[in-house]
């Protein structure tokens, strides 16, 4: 059994760690609330944009934008949104598993895969696995803007325009609640039709465009992709802070349990030490 002094040092070390994880839990909770506010503010715009674009994809357009046309898939692109830092449980690894599963399905069909990565964790993971990375951005902080993402988005859009990729997906963690973050693989291009099939049957979504369909769609569809990527980033940020808060809470609780266990061991060691001293005293007195 370890000595009482050694156990006491371990208890002190665990208590210091507990203070750190407790502080990180409070910081993550504060950041999560701010991230939720940004996510809630941008979500209605992103969802409405998705619905409108879905309706446009079903319409009988005179001008058929390239982003609306299905083509043979020889190469698939993914924009993967991860975190820059760890200590957020299995958030990133669960996301990477979802991405890899989707990539394997396309690889089985003979398609190649290109990646644009957001966050250091994605870069470290996929570069270690030998993936082809066309763009990478990191260090977005706790308050990212669309301008921070435009570079990576443009790289993938240019690749799509040039026929270098035939389908584009966004991979991110959707914030459901504090305890649940759901890995998502959403198709960006070609534009998916609206999921509301009942509504689609009742209506034919034909629009009148001013000044002309090409000019408007060229701008609108790029804004659509940018808005979806931005929404994915803020959703992932809220998910990161929630996962980190839960992980740090669990670490703090585990530290408390470990301290209690060590305290019992310390008490037993101290009791054994006292018993041994008393035994030695009695033995010495008897010898005299």
Swiss-Prot record:
What is the official name of this protein in its record? ATP synthase gamma chain
Q: How does it assemble?
A: F-type ATPases have 2 components, CF(1) - the catalytic core - and CF(0) - the membrane proton channel. CF(1) has five subunits: alpha(3), beta(3), gamma(1), delta(1), epsilon(1). CF(0) has three main subunits: a, b and c.
Q: Which organism is it from?
A: Aeromonas hydrophila subsp. hydrophila (strain ATCC 7966 / DSM 30187 / BCRC 13018 / CCUG 14551 / JCM 1027 / KCTC 2358 / NCIMB 9240 / NCTC 8049)
Q: Which NCBIfam families match?
A: ATPsyn_F1gamma, PRK05621.1-1
Record localization: Cell inner membrane
List the GO molecular function terms. ATP binding; proton-transporting ATP synthase activity, rotational mechanism
Q: What does this protein do?
A: Produces ATP from ADP in the presence of a proton gradient across the membrane. The gamma chain is believed to be important in regulating ATPase activity and the flow of protons through the CF(0) complex.
Superkingdom assignment = Bacteria
**Database matches in HAMAP family:** ATP_synth_gamma_bact
- Lipid bilayer topology: Peripheral membrane protein
CDD domains given for it?
F1-ATPase_gamma
Family in the record: Belongs to the ATPase gamma chain family.
Q: Cite the InterPro entries for this sequence.
A: ATP_synth_F1_ATPase_gsu, ATP_synth_F1_gsu, ATP_synth_F1_gsu_CS
Recorded GO CC terms: plasma membrane; proton-transporting ATP synthase complex
Please tell me where this protein is predominantly located.
Answer: membrane
Keywords attached to this entry: ATP synthesis, Cell inner membrane, Cell membrane, CF(1), Hydrogen ion transport, Ion transport, Membrane, Transport
Q: Sorted alphabetically, which Pfam families does this protein's record hold?
A: ATP-synt
- Which example biological process does GO assign this protein? proton motive force-driven plasma membrane ATP synthesis
């Amino acid at each position: 059994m370890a000595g009482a002094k050694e156990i006491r040092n371990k208890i002190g070390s665990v208590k210091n760690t507990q203070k750190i994880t407790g502080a990180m839990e409070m910081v993550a909770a504060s950041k999560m609330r701010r991230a939720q506010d940004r996510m809630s503010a941008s979500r209605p715009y992103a969802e409405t944009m998705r619905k409108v674009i879905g309706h446009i994809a079903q319409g009988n357009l005179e001008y058929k934008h390239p982003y609306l046309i299905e083509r043979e898939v020889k190469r698939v692109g993914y924009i993967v949104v991860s975190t820059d830092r760890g200590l957020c449980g299995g958030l990133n690894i669960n996301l990477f598993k979802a991405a890899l599963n989707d990539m394997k399905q396309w690889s089985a069909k003979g398609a190649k895969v290109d990646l644009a990565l957001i966050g250091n964790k994605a870069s470290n993971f996929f570069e270690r696995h030998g993936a082809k990375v066309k763009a990478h951005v990191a260090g977005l902080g706790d308050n990212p803007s669309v301008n921070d993402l435009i570079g990576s988005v443009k790289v993938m859009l240019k690749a799509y325009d040039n026929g270098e990729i035939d389908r584009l997906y966004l991979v991110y963690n959707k914030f459901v609640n504090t305890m649940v973050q759901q890995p998502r693989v959403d198709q960006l291009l070609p534009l998916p039709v609206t999921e509301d099939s009942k509504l689609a049957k009742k209506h034919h979504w034909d629009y009148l465009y001013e000044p002309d369909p090409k000019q408007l769609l060229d701008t609108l569809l790029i804004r659509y992709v940018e808005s979806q990527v931005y929404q994915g980033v803020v959703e992932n940020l809220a998910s990161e802070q929630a996962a980190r808060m839960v992980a740090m809470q669990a670490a703090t609780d585990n530290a408390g349990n470990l301290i209690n266990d060590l305290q019992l061991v310390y008490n037993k060691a101290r009791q054994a030490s006292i018993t041994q001293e008393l035994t030695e005293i009695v033995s010495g007195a008897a010898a005299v």
